[in-house]
């Protein structure tokens, strides 16, 4: 085991969960439990030209720091630069393939244990191979084929079975790095962060400072308590959350939130009508909502809709689905909120600031009710609202919203995080 360990924390065997992380000392809300540099990471293709590929910073991309960053990242930069030149416009490996290529390169360059692996090594990651269905196995084989296709001249590969294990490990243990508005920046592996088990009422939150993951308490944690993070978006009711957990992580959550289902009624709130909808009508509408959400998720993933339909048609789909669901669901129902959030995103893309603001105003109150107290989803919504208000010359409302975002982010990100300094500057500059 890595000699340093993590101060105030220990790896232990969590009953019914396997490996876990446990506190050895008390932590207060906002305390930094530990930080973990990325073992391997990759900037998403869409952010090239906006962020430094070495540190994910925006500012160093536009000044002299970029040259030193590029020098530091040269071994990984070279891994992609040469094949990009060779393949040109045909260079299109998935982010998972790119990340896995970097892991293989890192293992060759740095075979010994790294500072990212103080309590958990990459080779110890769970793969859940025995739980993969044929569809997931086929996807992994497609990724392996892409890895060979794009990187065969620049990497040495282990045998196919070893690559299957590695891709399965990356799928279960990879992290998405997001900015202050929860926009996707890239993907990474943080071994010690991956040691934490999941709960739908987590006591810590993971945020990022460039390619460094930071874990802070969002509840008081006593010595002997297990440290829990959340692997998923907590907006949805128990059944939906566990469907996602089973599909991606191969377990069913048994936390207090999932056992009591206390918030489910409010999350799937039904309209109060003189002639209340029947149980069958409610079930049908829930089924419709889940199907619409899944269709949108797939469309966004494959970019099908963006290539085949203008944004106005996307917005129409959002509006029609809301109209249909509103015959049964209240506006505070999470399925309604999901489609409102999608609509807000389309409005932002179309630069329809008034439309985006109207959706954000509808979303923020139920978000604050459904999500935990220190939620990044709530903070990012306040942040978007604040920036919209400021842009539309509603300074007082904008300042109020931005300060609400800061109050959450000071706990989740830490008071010294660059994002918070930037938001404070936004307030001062108006």
Which ranges hold each PLM region?
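Short alpha-helical interaction motifs and adjacent low-complexity tails used for partner binding
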Residues: 1-64, 68-430
């Amino acid at each position: 085991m890595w000699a340093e360990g993590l101060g105030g924390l220990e790896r232990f065997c969590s009953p019914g969960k396997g490996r876990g992380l446990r506190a050895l000392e008390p932590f207060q809300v906002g305390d930094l439990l530990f930080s973990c540099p990325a073992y391997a990471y990759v900037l998403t293709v869409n952010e090239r030209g906006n962020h430094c590929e070495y540190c994910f910073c925006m500012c160093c991309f536009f000044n002299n720091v970029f040259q030193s960053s590029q020098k530091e990242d040269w071994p990984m930069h070279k891994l992609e630069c040469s094949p990009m030149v060779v393949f040109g416009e045909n260079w299109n490996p998935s982010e998972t393939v790119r990340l896995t290529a970097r892991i293989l390169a890192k293992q060759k360059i740095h075979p010994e244990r790294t500072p990212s692996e103080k309590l958990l090594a990459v080779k110890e990651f769970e793969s859940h191979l025995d739980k993969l269905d044929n569809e997931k196995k086929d996807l992994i084989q497609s990724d392996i084929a892409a890895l060979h296709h794009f990187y065969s001249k620049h990497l040495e590969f282990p045998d196919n079975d070893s690559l299957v294990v590695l891709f399965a490990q990356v799928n279960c243990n990879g992290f998405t790095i997001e900015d202050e508005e929860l926009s996707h920046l890239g993907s990474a592996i943080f071994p010690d962060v991956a040691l934490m088990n999941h709960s739908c009422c987590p006591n810590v939150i993971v945020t990022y400072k460039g390619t460094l993951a930071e874990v802070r308490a969002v509840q008081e944690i006593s010595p002997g308590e297990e440290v829990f993070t959340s692997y998923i978006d907590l907006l949805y009711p128990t059944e939906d959350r566990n469907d996602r957990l089973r599909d991606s992580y191969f377990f069913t959550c048994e936390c207090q939130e999932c056992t009591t289902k206390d918030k489910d009624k409010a999350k799937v709130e039904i309209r109060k009508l003189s002639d209340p909808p029947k149980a069958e009508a409610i079930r049908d509408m829930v089924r419709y909502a889940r199907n619409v959400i899944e269709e949108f998720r797939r469309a966004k993933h494959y970019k099908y809709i963006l290539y085949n339909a203008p944004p106005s048609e996307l917005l129409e789909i959002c509006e029609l689905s809301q109209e249909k669901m509103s015959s049964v669901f209240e506006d505070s129902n999470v399925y309604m909120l999901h489609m409102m959030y999608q609509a807000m995103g389309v409005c932002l893309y179309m630069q329809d600031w008034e439309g985006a603001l109207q959706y954000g105003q509808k979303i923020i109150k139920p978000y604050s009710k459904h999500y935990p107290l220190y939620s990044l989803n709530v903070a990012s919504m306040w942040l978007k609202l604040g920036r919209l208000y400021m842009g539309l010359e509603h300074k007082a409302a904008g300042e109020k919203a931005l300060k609400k975002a800061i109050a959450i982010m000071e706990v989740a990100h830490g008071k010294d995080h660059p994002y918070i300094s930037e938001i404070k500057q936004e307030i001062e500059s108006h």
